[in-house]
């Protein structure tokens, strides 16, 4: 275990004997769950299923945006204070920013885990993720995906880089003082798992199937 009691891979994206200071990768937990899901199906190794539950339980307990946020009940992809024990933001943009595509991936893996264990908490969390994403979906265009790549969970504003600087408090005032190049994080294409999340919940007849079907069609048409 790491210094906060969690297993090392729940805090870090790189293994180094002298203790790497970077937090986890944005899709790290979801990719591990996806791989373990396939491996468990192949081997039936119960220790693999136990590890899947450990990762999902820890991430659920330490990563979700508040239900009062504009983007509620979604996991933050990064632990800004690496060994503090919570995931609270984005590796580049900092605290408060999440990545909707990673949330969809996590929800998809939670459904797989629910189907393997029968544990309703995984299904309930997946439904909350799907509800938020379905409620936020937009048609998209050449410059905007149906959901932004990065968004501030509390304010609902997409993440932004100004003159190659990441967003910071007071940036809007600085923009007004100079000619600045602004690049918002409005575009991503990693939506396959999100489509899978909607598809799984529709098949299970859980959650709000009408909203999921609409979001599925909007996203598929955009892709």
Where are the model-predicted features located?
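Glycan-recognition and catalytic cores of secretory/periplasmic carbohydrate-active enzymes
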Residues: 1-223
């Amino acid at each position: 275990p790491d210094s906060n009691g969690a297993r090392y891979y729940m805090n870090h994206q790189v293994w180094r004997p002298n203790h790497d200071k970077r937090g986890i990768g944005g899709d790290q937990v979801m990719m591990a769950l996806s791989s373990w899901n396939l491996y468990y199906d192949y081997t039936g190794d119960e220790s693999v299923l136990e590890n899947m539950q450990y990762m999902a339980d820890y991430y659920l307990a330490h990563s979700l945006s508040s239900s009062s946020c504009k983007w509620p009940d979604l996991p933050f992809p990064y632990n800004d204070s690496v060994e503090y024990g919570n995931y609270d933001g984005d590796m580049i943009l900092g605290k408060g920013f999440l990545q909707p595509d990673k949330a969809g991936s996590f929800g998809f893996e939670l459904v797989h885990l629910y189907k393997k264990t029968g544990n309703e908490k995984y299904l309930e969390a997946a439904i909350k993720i799907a509800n938020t994403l379905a409620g936020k979906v937009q048609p998209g265009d050449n410059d905007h995906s149906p959901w932004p790549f990065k968004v501030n969970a509390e304010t609902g504003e997409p993440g932004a880089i100004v003159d190659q600087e990441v967003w910071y408090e007071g940036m809007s005032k600085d923009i007004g003082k100079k000619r600045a190049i602004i690049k918002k994080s409005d575009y991503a294409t990693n939506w396959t798992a999100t489509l899978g999340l909607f598809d799984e919940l529709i098949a299970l007849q859980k959650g709000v199937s009408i909203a999921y079907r609409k979001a599925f069609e909007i996203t598929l048409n955009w892709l």
